[in-house]
Amino acid sequence: MTAGAAPRILKHQVVRAELDRMLDGMRIGDPFPAEREIAEQFEVARETVRQALRELLIDGRVERRGRTTVVARPKIRQPLGMGSYTEAAKAQGLSAGRILVAWSDLTADEVLAGVLGVDVGAPVLQLERVLTTDGVRVGLETTKLPAQRYPGLRETFDHEASLYAEIRSRGIAFTRTVDTIDTALPDAREAALLGADARTPMFLLNRVSYDQDDVAIEQRRSLYRGDRMTFTAVMHAKNSAIVS
């Protein structure tokens, strides 16, 4: 194709555009037409419809409820910053919940010891929880903490509460985080815990948080459903001139 040639529009993209217009006139929770109905309406193969619906699912415009497809809520906006998931959800008028998967006792290998600033072989607490918003599973969070720094945490911490708030209550201030974000597909276990299709694209956020003395607080791995979450960042120039 030459630079001046018009791009080829695939049939499922035409159907997708029509379905987007249809969705604009529907309300959250409304049932969406079945594949067969859409195929008959637009006189296309059902495989074409499946491709269009797949894109709508990934973009979070529709969601599956059993065998029914319905109009989805808008994606949850998660600001990139030191705030917690709970704080972000509440700021949008949503309820944030957590389901306990497991507490685990680990020992730090060389890599984890370097990240957390502890000795090799030091005890590490691991907390794994499913994140929910208004009852919908949207993320899987795995946090590793130096056990000696948080005595009694497993016995006293309410797993449905914000871990950040609990850590702050112990006099520890979050002053810096180092985040990396990738895309990933869930493995079978992760997909089952999130109630998602194994082909659903995910955001993978790895974070190390530091306190006022620049000592590591935690190492966190968060897997977020790409069809339910989106990330936002606000950037400020250090001076008035921005050179591109």
Curated annotation (Swiss-Prot):
Any matching Pfam family: UTRA
Gene Ontology biological-process entries: negative regulation of DNA-templated transcription
Superkingdom to which the source organism belongs: Bacteria
Entry-linked PROSITE patterns: HTH_GNTR
Residue ranges of the annotated DNA-binding region, renumbered to this chain: 35-54
HTH gntR-type domain location: 8-74
Gene3D superfamilies: Chorismate lyase-like (3.40.1410.10), Winged helix-like DNA-binding domain superfamily/Winged helix DNA-binding domain (1.10.10.10)
Alphabetical UniProt keywords: Cytoplasm, DNA-binding, Repressor, Transcription, Transcription regulation
Chief location: cytoplasm
Cellular-component GO terms for this entry: cytoplasm
Coiled coil location: none
A Gene Ontology molecular function term of the record: DNA-binding transcription factor activity
InterPro entries in alphabetical order: Bact_HTH_transcr_reg, Chorismate_lyase_/UTRA_dom_sf, Tscrpt_reg_HTH_GntR, UTRA, WH-like_DNA-bd_sf, WH_DNA-bd_sf
Compartments it resides in: Cytoplasm
Induction profile: By phosphate.
Transmembrane regions: none
Functional note: Represses the phnDCE operon, involved in the uptake of phosphate, under conditions of phosphate availability in the cell.
Name of the protein described by the UniProt record: HTH-type transcriptional repressor PhnF
Native source species: Mycolicibacterium smegmatis (strain ATCC 700084 / mc(2)155)
Annotated gene: phnF
